Amino acid sequence: MKFKSLITTTLALGVIASTGANLDTNEASAAAKQIDKSSSSLHHGYSKIQIPYTITVNGTSQNILSSLTFNKNQQISYKDIENKVKSVLYFNRGISDIDLRLSKQAKYTVHFKNGTKRVVDLKAGIHTADLINTSDIKAISVNVDTKKQVKDKEAKANVQVPYTITVNGTSQNILSNLTFKKNQQISYKDLENNVKSVLKSNRGITDVDLRLSKQAKFTVNFKNGTKKVIDLKAGIYTANLINTGGIKNININVETKKQAKDKEAKVNNQVPYSINLNGTTTNIQSNLAFSNKPWTNYKNLTTKVKSVLKSDRGVSERDLKHAKKAYYTVYFKNGGKRVIHLNSNIYTANLVHAKDVKRIEVTVKTVSKVKAERYVPYTIAVNGASNPTLSDLKFTGDSRVSYSDIKKKVKSVLKHDRGIGERELKYAEKATYTVHFKNGTKKVINLNSNISQLNLLYVKDIKNIDIDVKTGAKAKVYSYVPYTIAVNGTTTPIASKLKLSNKQLIGYQDLNKKVKSVLKHDRGINDIELKFAKQAKYTIHFKNGKTQVVDLKSDIFTRNLFSVKDIKKIDINVKQQSKSNKALNKVTNKATKVKFPVTINGFSNLVSNEFAFLHPHKITTNDLNAKLRLALRSDQGITKHDIGLSERTVYKVYFKDGSSKLEDLKAAKQDSKVFKATDIKKVDIEIKF
């Protein structure tokens, strides 16, 4: 069982991420558009195309109603298609990357509309630099052949023995069988372990229940007509061995001791009760259970009444404390009655016998919550367009509110209904709300003003609230710079642009990060591939006609700063070496493996303790971060996204010289101080979701 399942449940669930949310971090945004997403005049990028696909696993296909979604007329690589294929394999058939690596065969075929096709091996990890147009693809068929032959062979070598379970004279139909290896010599002790296992899983009978039972035995019926009865309570076994192929079936019989419970049930006295909550009474099938001895007092009786109020009607101690009425009436069989207040801490010293009680009536009248809640209708107009709003602003508690309270409510519904947050309001041309009173007056409040109105007003005097926002164009905050990417002389049209902030000057080092980000996002070229490329550079074309060429492989940058508004466009050019993969493998093979123990929340042996470093005598915290994240993902399935959603993910590095250092795995930047991997004594990781 993976450690991830110990510390999180429905991340699951709960956990939902969209690839679109990463556009800002990838620094490759669509062309400038206004904040108002409801405007029909905005350009939303590519139109979509649906490509049908099939999945065949071990020769079996399933009907798949969904399709793979791509941008229409977009140039994509086979690596992009492979990512899509792996995603649907995992989603539709539960086949992970590890399953693919261990499979006999894993490939997909791209069928083009011109009749040609291309077969790609999912296990190879080698991708051609060719780009294909999504509109040329007719269909995609996926074929995976997993290694199940060994399991099939084992299944044939197994024998299924039917069994029955009888508990207290009652039998249930059991469709499963006991599984043994064919013609295996087993002892009665082994057979007993199997019997105890099915007793626990099918009927919930444990070893303790068997020891306390009146009778517990199982009968082995052989194919030759003989049988053997074994006492499950004895713990004594014969040394005889039996052949699994000679067993016909097994009958299990258990008789538990229920007499004590039956006797106890007879001495309990049942008292009927009813609950009247705010004038409404519901039928209650259960009774209050009391023992004949000893006598009970009214304090214990009050505790029982409060318990059924909580379980049957959800009325807690707090609700009772603020209730208008809260009492119960005890009716006796002799015609008398007694009223007890649930909020009183004074009890009489009288004792009452449960046999003398005829019934108990509980009456509770809670404070009406309607008076404490007030609703004010509102409208929202963004850039002159108003949508009908069916909900109202809800005010609870005090009947008087301040303009500061109203402002918080207004900002909340702007965020919830129209997706306008604090940042958009800050740069909006206009952001106001108007409070219309029932006496005909009105008050206009600026949402961006920090001046607070000290006046308090009654919510019941407000007729409605009109919210008006005019967003400023995002171009005032951001500039969108067009760019091109040429890889090995091949250029593909790119509809998106680099999104750069206008609020401050930018340097070549910052621009380098943006360029590397779009190279990785658009063409799948990472830092290692850039390192081994023949040429990797980009040219900045300024609006004044000047150009500046920057080498992506160099770590030396000029200190010049310039305005984003002065950039006309950026051309990116990468020439890859044909033997880069071999060179990369050669470097990887030279990596030095360093061992040190790693624990997660105090548990050891959950992740690998062996890490490969290219330069173990010269690493940074960032290098260690990458290795730990990789180990968490591969060994425990904890991804970078899971770490981002966690409440706390830190690790402490203990060095051999006695020093230690605490680092945050969620942080983007770490200390650049260099140290030796061989100096690490151990690493303790703490994850809290």
From Swiss-Prot:
Segment forming the signal sequence: 1-30
Keywords carried by this UniProt record: Repeat, Signal
MAP repeats: 45-154, 155-264, 265-374, 375-474, 475-584, 589-689
One Pfam family per UniProt: MAP
Top-level taxon of the source organism: Bacteria
Gene3D superfamilies given in the database record: 3.10.20.120
Domain-level remarks: Each MAP domain contains a 31-residue subdomain that shares striking sequence homology with a segment present in the peptide binding groove of the beta chain of the MHC class II proteins from different mammalian species.
Known function: Both native and recombinant protein bound to labeled vitronectin, fibrinogen, recombinant osteopontin and fibronectin. It was also shown to be able to bind to a 15-amino acid synthetic peptide of vitronectin. Map could affect the severity of arthritis and osteomyelitis in mice through a T-cell-mediated mechanism and could play a role in abscess formation through a T-cell-independent mechanisms. It could potentiate the survival of the bacterium by modulating host immunity.
Protein name (Swiss-Prot/TrEMBL): Protein map
